[in-house]
Curated annotation (Swiss-Prot):
Keywords (A to Z) from UniProt: Ethylene biosynthesis, Fruit ripening, Iron, Metal-binding, Oxidoreductase, Vitamin C
Subunit (UniProt): Monomer.
Entry-linked SUPFAM superfamilies: Clavaminate synthase-like
Protein name: 1-aminocyclopropane-1-carboxylate oxidase 1
InterPro entries assigned: DIOX_N, IPNS-like_FE2OG_OXY, IPNS-like_sf, Oxoglu/Fe-dep_dioxygenase_dom, Plant_2OG-oxidoreductases
Record PANTHER family: OXOGLUTARATE/IRON-DEPENDENT DIOXYGENASE
Biological processes per GO annotation: ethylene biosynthetic process; fruit ripening
Residues the entry annotates as binding Fe cation: H177, D179, H234
EC number, UniProt record: 1.14.17.4
Similarity comment text for this entry: Belongs to the iron/ascorbate-dependent oxidoreductase family.
Length: 314
């Protein structure tokens, strides 16, 4: 099995730019995931985010999670659970408008830190989109422009903790799925593992690394690149000891963004290669919400069928 791709992003600014871009390209084509080091985000900021997130979980969410587990009898399950994930989460929205001030139980300093964290992640996401454009032969800013729609991108952060699980063989931390959106930036626990991706029919661990940011591609990147780059199935395995922190930020198209394979990519496709569908992002999300934990291919086929269905006129 090939080694999980780790990219030193600082090298794009020097003599190793071409080799670094090729490493990113190979990861996007063959893994759908890669891990960034020297990505330019402050390690002090990352340390603060981690400490505050873990403190917040202990103070306000751990007891609630224990009560939920007791109420559902999850300590004593005897057969595999298919409709529930062993995770404690809350969601922060940054763009097009922020909801950070509305989330209850967050200390003011934590709100401020997460706002700063989001600003830095947004910059990193847009830098990565431009590197993808360069690799794909698209004009600089193409992906950002597609994602903007009329009101800007959707950008938000899912803050998760995966507590120790008494039955990790029967309950997943997070069931297998591919992500619906654009580009996902994950700041994860560097001590407690659990994230896995599906590669060549086998589940592969995503290695926890101190101060790294794990990148994975969503379904929209697969569509825009007409399958050259892939979104891949991934999951979180619950652990019997240790609480795993996961802070995943999703830089997604705006609701009214029109998604379709990029013309410059289609020009290079072989004649027998299928063409991916065209659709409005919000329509895809409505479909995805009910089919998240299923294969992506039927979602693409459903959007293609919708695209070819004639609109009735009076």
């Amino acid at each position: 099995m090939a080694t999980f791709p780790v990219v030193d992003l600082s090298l794009v600014n020097g003599e190793e730019r071409a080799a670094t871009l090729e490493k990113i390209n190979d990861a996007c084509e063959n893994w759908g995931f890669f891990e960034l080091v020297n990505h330019g985000m402050s390690t002090e900021l990352l340390d603060t985010v981690e400490k505050m997130t873990k403190d917040h979980y202990k103070k306000t969410m751990e007891q609630r999670f224990k009560e939920m587990v007791a109420a559902k009898g999850l300590d004593d399950v005897q057969s595999e659970i298919h409709d529930l994930d062993w995770e404690s989460t809350f969601f922060l929205r940054h763009l097009p408008s922020s909801n950070i001030s509305e989330i209850p139980d967050l200390e003011e300093e934590y709100r401020k830190t997460m706002k700063e964290f989001a600003v830095e992640l947004e910059k990193l996401a847009e830098k990565l989109l431009d590197l993808l454009c360069e690799n794909l032969g698209l004009e600089k800013g193409y992906l950002k422009k597609v994602f903007y729609g009329s009101k800007g991108p959707n950008f938000g952060t899912k803050v998760s903790n995966y507590p120790p699980c008494p039955k990790p063989d029967l309950i997943k931390g997070l069931r297998a799925h591919s992500d619906a959106g654009g580009i996902i930036l994950l700041f994860q626990d560097d001590k407690v593992s659990g994230l896995q991706l599906l590669k060549d029919g086998e589940w592969v661990d995503v290695p926890p690394m101190h101060h790294s940011i794990v990148i994975n591609l969503g379904d929209q990147i697969e569509v825009i690149t007409n399958g050259k780059y892939k979104s891949v199935m991934h999951r979180v395995i619950a652990q019997s000891d240790g609480t795993r922190m996961s802070i995943a930020s999703f830089y997604n198209p705006g609701n009214d963004s029109f998604i379709s394979p990029a013309p410059a990519v289609l020009e290079k496709k072989t004649e027998d290669a299928p063409t991916y569908p065209k659709f409005v992002f919000d329509d895809y999300m409505k479909l995805y919400s009910g089919l998240k934990f299923q294969a992506k291919e039927p979602r693409f086929e459903a959007m293609k069928a919708k695209e070819s269905t004639p609109v009735a006129t009076a």
